[in-house]
UniProtKB/Swiss-Prot annotation:
GO terms for cellular component: cell envelope Sec protein transport complex; cytosol; plasma membrane. Residues 876-908 are annotated as: Disordered. May bind 1 zinc ion per subunit. This is Protein translocase subunit SecA. It holds the Pfam family SecA_DEAD. Part of the Sec protein translocase complex. Interacts with the SecYEG preprotein conducting channel. Has a central role in coupling the hydrolysis of ATP to the transfer of proteins into and across the cell membrane, serving both as a receptor for the preprotein-SecB complex and as an ATP-driven molecular motor driving the stepwise translocation of polypeptide chains across the membrane. It comes from Shewanella baltica (strain OS185). GO terms for biological process: intracellular protein transmembrane transport; protein import; protein targeting; protein transport by the Sec complex. The lineage of its organism: Bacteria, Pseudomonadati, Pseudomonadota, Gammaproteobacteria, Alteromonadales. PANTHER family: CHLOROPLAST PROTEIN-TRANSPORTING ATPASE (PTHR30612:SF0), SECA INNER MEMBRANE COMPONENT OF SEC PROTEIN SECRETION SYSTEM (PTHR30612). GO terms for molecular function: ATP binding; metal ion binding; protein-exporting ATPase activity. Its cofactor is Zn(2+). Its main location: membrane. Residues 898-908 have a biased composition (Basic residues). The gene is secA.
Length: 908
């Protein structure tokens, strides 16, 4: 109550932010008259003027008003479009490391030109990031004339470009592209073998369109570059035949599992577990098929891989449904994004789940892959010096944007007042009653000529509704992942008089539904249209537009509530753009997933008390509140999972930072001779310590063992025992120095034989290849550690602390092994000439050709001991150093308590 009173007196934080920015809008508007008088040449010259001022020490803030006024005037001349004041506000929000919530139809694409131009003036590059190739190309081509008029270059970064094309795209002032491509390019750059192979510049300013989709929905999906692992498709096929023999355990309203059964499903957590009876049954079936030895347990250490396959098969059969979670197309299982309803070709569930689904559907089973490099969008985008985003629905996730990314959300007002009528939900007892009510509402809308957009949560539901409409002879269009090729065409005409469009959550995000249909698209379909043809098309459209407005505008009809309020708001946001008329309503039933799992008891009890009859709906604020509370519960749970996964992921950030930074230093260095010298002192010294313990008596020395080890691993044949027999005064330290010097002399002889330049190149190639191989193995070890770490909780240990401790130990091993292996290889390999280095490079490029890019969804339960099977386990990612460089004798920033040179600085 007091909070509301204070807001009334002082205004909300959002209001105060906008009030502060409004002063700059006034300054921009004051410049408009003067800028209108400028010639084109004078307006274009502003870009060079701004750059000179920045070079002289001016800040971006000091030139913002003039820069925005320049873009607004250029837009008027190039596009005949003037930025509204609210778009200027949006541009300022985006320049200040914030997220701008701008409603559908408010011109986010044009708004983005303001901060993109301003930040491109620094010459460091601007990345404008969208969710798919179509939107990236469309926005780049649409805005190219404006930016080129102002003297800036525009690049497009999409899938399928070659290295030179990508480098050109990144060197442009403003680069449009998809989040996936930017992430993959970062990974590829950190696998490059020469500076020339890198394509990205340092990450400066990212402006993300549909920021909620990328930073929230995609947050847990790691981008993975992988290579093929061993083929186990036969095992998946054999185990797939076991699952149909299993019976699900009954479940009553008491939430207690009762009755006989082999497995139980927890629908809230989206998990499945074997019962004791189920474990015994599976073991017996495996024994019958000769896959498990008589008397052996599926849970013994030797059978962990078999257990992994059985669990994957059970999840595939019980938790993943065709046409809901995936579709089968061209003999492939393709994941359907639960948030957008779009298919995601190329993405695969990890931990064998995708192969298990392929076995279930009887399609070709692709090999499992081994991770070579990976990063999550969370960690990739946190590396940008400046980060901003825009979307129509961010306010419900404002806390997460602030907590995870440090980004405040500002709700930008609409240019015209919102007049859409959002009606209360109607709740029915059964799905059949709900669908009959939906059909009746659609018929009513068609009678008065009102266009309808029907939003569904799955492909299966959209096809069910389509069948009902065919039965009722209602003309309609279906827009789902199976028919996405016609997406732009269907969305363009979804606002025509009396049209009915059924859409999954994708609902053509990024494309506005224009009342009366899209007249621009009609003109585009004509070859060289005349002015008369254009005028006629526009006049016809105006008549249709007025008819639709008179009928009530676009009517949004939701067939089910999504787990996230944000997705529901996105659907509602399709109507009421730019002050248009419109309406929305959700139809629900007690059989809907959200209602059944989270809100059933309270609402169904209320409905029973009211004594509802068949076909009757309940419409009450209490019901809407109960549903919203259910959605809040799910959102909070999903946020906790994302937060927890990120906490685990952050443990590995230091490691990736060290490896990638060291890799780039190695690649950029002309020579790593000093590094090799430091490493060889450490490696040879460590080997000597094993056979001649420091400060020990000679009786404890193992000289024969040391001689043999030095010869086997470093090709160093030294008469150490002979030295000791002949020289009584040869003590431990001088012996150590003599052995290290002997290795140095042998290596010097190798250098004289092949030439210093060839050996320097070879050293770099060996170091990079060894580091990459060990990093790949380290990633696999970290994956295995993550998958089982939650079990430490049963031993009264903190899984996060255990993960931190053990991952640090694994990294220590990586550093020690790297140094040892590099010196061992350099000692053994005989380099004859430059051709040997080139041959090594050729083999490496051949291996590179075999790697593939994956977007793998992994089960969250492996990390947190439970959770949504659709959640993805985050992967390690590097961070950019915020403060000063750490000195070699300073405490290591990882928190181990050791000096930096003895910890994460060991490689330097």
């Amino acid at each position: 109550m007091f909070g509301k009173l204070l807001t009334k007196v002082f205004g909300s934080r959002n209001d105060r932010t906008l009030k502060g920015l409004q002063k700059i809008v006034i300054s921009i508007n004051a410049l408009e008259a003067d800028y209108e008088k400028l010639t084109d040449e004078a307006l274009k010259a502003k870009t060079a003027e701004f750059r000179e001022r920045l070079a002289a020490g001016a800040s971006l803030d000091s030139i913002m008003a003039e820069a925005f006024a320049t873009v607004r005037e250029a837009s008027k001349r190039v596009f005949d479009m003037r930025h509204f004041d609210v778009q200027l506000l949006g541009g300022m929000v985006l320049d200040s490391n914030r997220i701008a919530e701008m409603r559908t139809g408010e011109g986010k694409t044009l708004t983005a030109t303001l901060p993109a131009y301003l930040n491109a003036l620094t010459g460091k590059g601007v990345h404008v990031i969208t969710v798919n190739d179509y939107l990236a190309r469309r926005d780049a081509e649409n805005n190219r004339p404006l930016f080129e008029f102002l003297g800036l270059t525009v690049g497009i970064n999409v899938a399928g470009l070659g290295q030179h094309e990508k480098k050109a795209a990144y060197n442009a002032d403003i680069t449009y592209g998809t989040n996936n491509e930017f992430g993959f390019d970062y990974l590829r750059d950190n696998m490059a073998f020469s500076p020339q192979e890198r394509v990205q510049r340092p990450l400066h300013y990212a402006l993300i369109d549909e920021v909620d989709s990328i930073l929230i929905d995609e947050a847990r999906t790691p981008l993975i570059i992988s290579g093929a692992a061993e083929d186990s498709s036969e095992l998946y096929i054999k185990i797939n035949t076991l699952i149909p023999n299993l019976i699900r355990q009954d479940k009553e309203d008491t939430e207690e599992y009762v009755g006989e059964g082999d497995y139980s499903i927890d629908e809230k957590a989206k998990q499945v577990h074997f019962t004791e009876r189920g474990q015994e049954k599976v073991e017996n079936l495996l024994i019958e098929r000769g896959m498990l030895a008589e008397g052996d347990s599926l849970y013994s250490a030797a059978n962990i891989s078999l257990l992994h396959h059985v669990n994957a098969a059970l999840r595939a059969h019980t938790l993943f449904e065709r046409d809901v979670d995936y579709i089968v197309q061209d003999n492939e299982v393709i994941i359907v994004d639960e948030h957008t309803g779009r298919t995601m070709p190329g993405r695969r569930w990890s931990e064998g789940l995708h192969q298990a689904v392929e076995a279930k559907e009887g399609v070709h089973i692709q090999n499992e892959n081994q991770t070579l490099a990976s990063i999550t969008f969370q960690n990739y985008f946190r590396q940008y010096e400046k980060l901003a985003g825009m979307t129509g629905t961010a306010d419900t996730e404002a806390f997460e944007f602030q907590h995870i990314y440090g980004l405040d959300t500002v709700v930008v007002p609409t240019n015209r007042p919102m007049v859409r009528k959002d009606m209360a939900d109607l709740v029915y007892l059964t799905a059949d009653e709900k669908y009959q009510a939906i059909i009746k509402d659609i018929k009513d809308c068609r009678e008065r000529g009102q266009p309808v957009l029907v939003g569904t949560v799955s492909i299966e539901q959209s096809e069910l509704l389509a069948r009902l409409m065919v039965q009722e002879k209602i003309p309609h269009e279906v827009l789902n992942a199976k028919f996405h090729e016609r997406e732009a065409e269907i969305v363009a005409q979804a606002g025509r008089t009396g049209s009915v469009t059924i859409a999954t959550n994708m609902a053509g995000r990024g494309t506005d539904i224009v009342l009366g249909g899209n007249w621009n698209m009609e003109i585009d379909e004509l070859d060289n249209p005349t002015a008369e043809q254009k005028a006629k098309i526009k006049a016809d459209w105006q008549i249709r537009h007025d008819e639709v407005v008179a009928a009530g505008g676009l009517h949004i009809l939701g067939t089910e509530r999504h787990e996230s309020r944000r997705i529901d708001n996105q659907l509602r946001g399709r109507a009421g753009r730019q002050g248009d008329a419109g309406s929305s309503r959700f139809y629900l039933s007690m059989e809907d997933s959200l209602m059944r799992i989270f809100a059933s008891d309270r609402v169904s009890g209320m409905m029973k008390k009211l004594g509802m009859e068949e076909g009757e709906a309940i419409e009450h604020p209490w019901v809407s509140r109960a549903i919203e509370n259910a959605q809040r519960k799910v959102e909070a749970r999903n946020f906790d999972i994302r937060k927890q996964l990120l906490e685990f992921d952050d443990v590995a950030n230091d490691q990736r930072q060290v490896v990638y930074a060291q890799r780039n230093e190695l690649m950029d260095a002309e020579s790593i001779e000093d590094t090799i010298q430091n490493i060889q002192d450490d490696v040879i010294g460590a080997v000597i310590d094993q056979y001649i313990p420091p400060q020990s008596v000679e009786e404890l020395w193992d000289i024969p063992g040391l001689e043999q080890r030095l010869h086997q691993e470093f090709m160093l044949k030294l008469p150490i025992q002979e030295w000791l027999d002949k020289e009584d005064d040869l003590h431990e330290e001088s012996l150590r120095e003599r052995i290290i010097t002997a290795w140095g002399d042998a290596y010097k002889a190798k250098e004289e034989m092949v030439g210093a330049q060839v050996l320097r190149q070879f050293e770099k190639a060996v170091m990079l290849q060894t580091l990459d191989g060990l990093w790949k193995e380290h990633l696999a070890a970290m994956d295995h550690l993550r998958q089982g770490i939650h079990l430490r909780g049963y031993a009264q240990k903190n899984p996060k602390q255990e993960y931190k401790r053990e991952s640090f130990e694994l990294f220590q091993q990586l550093l020690n092994t790297l140094k040892h292996d590099v010196i061992s290889v350099l000692s053994k390999v005989q380099v004859q000439a430059q051709s040997d280095v080139e041959e090594m490079e050729a083999r490496r490029r051949e291996e590179d050709a075999k790697i593939q890019r994956d977007y793998q969804h992994a089960a969250a339960e492996s990390l947190v001991g439970g959770g949504d099977e659709h959640e993805a386990v985050t992967a390690q990612a590097p961070m950019i150093r915020d403060g000063e460089k750490v000195g070699r004798n300073d405490p290591c920033p990882c928190g181990s308590g050791r000096k930096y040179k003895q910890c994460h600085g060991k490689l330097s």
